[in-house]
């Protein structure tokens, strides 16, 4: 278990920038626009061997303000849960603007928690400004410290203070290995396809904000849970739009992280809106996942909104549209009725097992001999490819190298034949399968056919 500290405050006081500086890496999205952090974001910090969990929360707004009304209640609920989870709190305020009524309201609210609170006056760019910037905040009655997350003033002292706060909780850190997170599953798809609803339905809790406004999830949110005696971690990613539709820098950052999450996770679930069908952007996402050899499942969501009489036609349409991803499993789901959701986790586990496949060189060469004897490669320009031997170069995904006299003699149709035969013999139904042909008569870069 980790001692947990939560960053709390009104919008645009620099919580996410402080979060990143304390962690020394860019984990939360930062920008001068209120409401950027909507879900609570977790990460592990470490200073001089003191480990702790840090939670970044959305800016608390007590009254309706312009267009923030849609997220007020949800952000407040996420912050409230973070306060309950944490053993200590850091109230972040803006030293440039001075104390505001909203600061006082937030302070009054978190004081009720009876937890240790550090008042952090941010945006103080030097010691000469410290006395003036902090003067008004003494009235709040908390232990206080002045910093500048942007320019680094007092950051070393802050890291030491946060480590002291973690030690003061009395919670002893127990190191977790990657196995503690279990199977990591990234959720990927266009905005408002239902990714967050699916995470909540599968985990059984309202962990990720759900709204019918596209773009609610702007950052990757990790959710670890147990199901059927197995541990899973969902990474609920921001929706991915066409680049021409990404109108602000915030969403650009989120899209990059969403795509990165899909390649770092064990398995990706690509969520598609049943009503919208396979859009151009969905096809681009498919091409990206196939190109990167990402093991993934396609979840056609909101199937409950399609009439029963039209579902067969819808399935036929999806089958035609997904021919390029013939090996990828497709499930039809509804987060409202829970239809189809029960198959996702077992399918993800099976897909992970397929990706981890390791076959000995001896067994592979017996398989190769059997395949080639039954179906010789076609003659190309009076020459036929001669297979010398094969080996497995990697797993996750399985990658096999065929050593032949000249890789130019392999046609795409024969490559597909070899892939299909290997899938059947090795029982690799859904995982990506990389096949490399390497010429033995001269040194040359590998040519990979996926």
Swiss-Prot record:
Residues 357-441 form the KH-like domain. SMART domains: AAA (SM00382). GO terms for molecular function: ATP hydrolysis activity; GTP binding. GTP 2 binds at residues 189-196, 236-240, 301-304. Pfam families: KH_dom-like, MMR_HSR1. InterPro entries: AAA+_ATPase (IPR003593), G_ENGA (IPR031166), GTP-bd (IPR006073), GTPase_Der (IPR016484), KH_dom-like (IPR032859), KH_dom-like_a/b (IPR015946), P-loop_NTPase (IPR027417), Small_GTP-bd (IPR005225). SUPFAM superfamilies: P-loop containing nucleoside triphosphate hydrolases. Keywords: GTP-binding, Nucleotide-binding, Repeat, Ribosome biogenesis. Residues 3-170, 183-356 form the EngA-type G domain. Signal peptide: none annotated. CDD domains: EngA1 (cd01894), EngA2 (cd01895). GTPase that plays an essential role in the late steps of ribosome biogenesis. Associates with the 50S ribosomal subunit. Belongs to the TRAFAC class TrmE-Era-EngA-EngB-Septin-like GTPase superfamily. EngA (Der) GTPase family. PANTHER family: GTPASE DER (PTHR43834:SF6). This is GTPase Der. It comes from Maridesulfovibrio salexigens (strain ATCC 14822 / DSM 2638 / NCIMB 8403 / VKM B-1763) (Desulfovibrio salexigens). The gene is der.
């Amino acid at each position: 278990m980790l001692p947990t500290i939560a960053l709390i405050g009104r919008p645009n006081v620099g919580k996410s920038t402080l979060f990143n500086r304390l962690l020394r890496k860019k984990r939360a999205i930062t920008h001068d626009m209120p409401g950027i952090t909507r879900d609570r974001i977790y990460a592990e910090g470490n200073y001089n061997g003191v480990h702790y969990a840090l939670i970044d929360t959305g800016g608390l707004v007590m009254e309706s303000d312009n267009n923030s009304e849609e997220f007020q209640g949800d952000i407040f609920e996420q912050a409230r849960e973070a306060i309950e989870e944490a053993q200590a709190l850091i109230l972040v305020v803006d030293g440039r603007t001075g104390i505001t009524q909203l600061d006082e309201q937030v302070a009054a609210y978190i004081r009720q928690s009876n937890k240790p609170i550090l008042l952090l006056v941010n945006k103080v760019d030097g010691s000469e400004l410290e006395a003036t910037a902090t003067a008004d905040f003494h009235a709040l009655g908390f232990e206080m410290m002045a910093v500048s997350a942007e320019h680094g003033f007092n950051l070393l002292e802050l890291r030491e203070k946060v480590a002291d706060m973690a030690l003061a909780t009395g919670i002893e850190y127990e190191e977790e290995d990657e196995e503690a997170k279990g199977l990591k599953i990234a959720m990927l798809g266009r905005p408002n396809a239902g990714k967050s609803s699916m995470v909540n339905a599968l985990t059984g809790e309202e962990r990720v904000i759900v709204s019918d406004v596209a773009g609610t999830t702007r950052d990757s949110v990790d959710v670890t849970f147990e199901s059927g005696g197995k541990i899973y971690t969902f990474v609920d990613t921001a929706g991915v739009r066409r680049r021409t539709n990404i109108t602000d820098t915030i969403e650009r950052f989120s899209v990059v992280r969403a795509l990165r999450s899909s390649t770092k996770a064990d398995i990706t679930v690509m969520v598609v809106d049943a009503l919208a069908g396979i859009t151009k952007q969905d096809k681009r996402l498919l091409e990206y996942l196939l190109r990167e050899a990402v093991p993934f499942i396609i979840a056609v969501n909101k199937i409950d909104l399609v009439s029963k009489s039209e579902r067969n036609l819808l399935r036929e349409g999806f089958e035609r549209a997904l021919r390029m991803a013939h090996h990828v499993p497709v499930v039809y789901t509804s987060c409202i009725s829970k239809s189809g959701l029960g198959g996702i986790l077992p399918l993800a586990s099976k897909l992970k097992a397929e990706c981890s496949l390791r076959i000995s060189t001896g067994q592979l060469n017996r398989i190769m001999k059997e395949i080639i004897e039954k179906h010789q490669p076609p003659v190309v320009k009076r020459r036929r490819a001669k297979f010398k031997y094969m080996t497995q170069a990697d797993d996750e995904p399985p990658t096999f190298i065929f050593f032949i006299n000249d890789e130019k003699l392999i046609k795409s149709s024969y490559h597909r034949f070899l892939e299909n035969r290997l899938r059947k013999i090795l029982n690799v139904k859904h995982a990506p399968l990389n096949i490399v042909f390497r010429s033995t008569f001269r040194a040359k870069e590998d040519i990979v056919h996926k």
